[in-house]
Every structure is written in C-alpha cells, then in structure tokens.
C-alpha cells in the first residue's frame, strides 16, 4: 500500500502540537468538524485512538459518527496514527 506525502510527513517526526489536519485523511472540512467536537490537535485524536484500544473498526466507526469522515479517509487516519504509534511508542 502506498502512502501519501502527508502520511509520510506525519509519521516521520514526533507529533508535538500539530493540528488535527496534519493527520492523513483529515482535511480542512473534517478538521473543522473534529475541532468543533473538541479534537483540535493531533495528540487529542491520538488519545481517542488509544482509548479505542488501537482497534481499526472502532476508530473508523467513531470518526464516521463524530465527524462524518468517509470510511476511506477514516482508514487513512487510522493507518497514519497506527504507524506513528509503532515508531514512537
């Protein structure tokens, strides 16, 4: 599976204080919806990923329900956070 430039840039360095839109699959529209729901930073969304026990199905469903993220974009976000976790924790 090939990854986007956005994905590679995100997983290539510590998360720090990056905006949620820095995560692959999360563009401006989904970013606004997530921010409105309280998930404005990448680390906040990463916390939700951890709360859902790194489970792809649960995380994808949660993103779909919370911000109307499509399944494809939600899977991109999951893969991005999952690969980041494998490298940094």
Swiss-Prot record:
InterPro entries (UniProt xref): BAF, BAF_prot, BAF_sf
Localisation per UniProt entry: Nucleus
GO biological process: chromosome organization; chromosome segregation; embryo development ending in birth or egg hatching; response to X-ray
Main location class: nucleus
Keyword Iron-sulfur: no
Keyword terms of this UniProt record: DNA-binding, Nucleus, Phosphoprotein
Classification via SMART domains: BAF
Keyword Cell inner membrane included in the entry's annotation: no
Post-translational modifications reported in the UniProt record: Phosphorylated by vrk-1. Phosphorylation by vrk-1 in mitosis is essential to achieve correct timing of recruitment of nuclear envelope components during nuclear envelope assembly. Dephosphorylated by protein phosphatase 2A (PP2A) following interaction with lem-4l during mitotic exit, leading to mitotic nuclear envelope reassembly.
GO molecular function: DNA binding
Family to which the UniProt record says this protein belongs: Belongs to the BAF family.
Quaternary context: Interacts with emr-1 and lem-2. Interacts with lem-4l, leading to decreased phosphorylation by VRK1 and promoting dephosphorylation by protein phosphatase 2A (PP2A).
Protein known as: Barrier-to-autointegration factor 1
Organism expressing this protein natively: Caenorhabditis briggsae
Lineage of the species this protein comes from: Eukaryota, Metazoa, Ecdysozoa, Nematoda, Chromadorea
Gene encoding the protein: baf-1
